Amino acid sequence: MFYQILSLLIWSSSFIAAKFAYTMLDAALMVQARLLISVFIVLPVCRRYLDKIPKNKWKPLLWLSFLNYVVVLMLQFIGLKYTSAASAETVIGLDPLLMVFIGHFFFRDKAEWYHWLCGLTAFAGVVIMIAGGHSGGNINFWGCLMIVAGSAVFCSITRPTQNLIADLGAPAYTSLSLAVSAVMCLPFSLLLAESYQINWSWSGGIALLYLGICCSWFGYWLWNKGMSRVPANLSGLLLTLEPVFGILMAVIVLDEYISTVSGLGMMIVVASAFAAVVLPKVLPKRPENGKAA
């Protein structure tokens, strides 16, 4: 669990670092650049695992790498370009509930009544947050929607990724998935980039290195290492930590303005996700086969 908490602390700062990187280059190019930086780190390690991967594991490895790095990162960081870092971090707070609902519909992990209640409350919180953006704070509906879509993809592949990591090992999966994703990302970064101009700055360069080394490689390495020891549902519940730190950093580091209405919506979303974590621990377990729990 320690590895995943540390990775969430790193990821919570990724949107803040990305805002600095956007002053230097386009969002799609930024995603490509951070993956390329990660490749230089993992490339020496990749060689030792290439011949050890069974042939029947390459197809799921390629698909999960494409979804986890290319699709998720493109959706979230292009969406971030249109909305504030604080609102983006708040929307990321929906991840635990998305994890539960996706598990309910696709993986037979039944959601309880309080999950549905928390999900409805969190959705209302997002609506309030976006509505409050009209009073200031640069909160954009389409930007938030793209980030939610990226989160939905991430939560959908958590269980298959966990199974693949159990077969290959976290070091092999992390290094190889980063390497192949950098190649698969190239046509999409060129297609989706609105500008190919690069305006060098120290703040943008340092932010890009941080995104490539810490957020792309080290953060995923920690997360994948922790996934081999932590159930998928618990992994989803740990994600409630990310928006809390992210919102605080957005206000302190970026000096982002949050209107009263948007702040209320953010609090509702974070509180709903937190309630989804706490309620299973405090409520009595449902009786099985007619017997008392």
Language model features with spans:
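Hydrophobic/aromatic residues within transmembrane alpha-helices
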Residues: A21, M30, R34, G79, ...
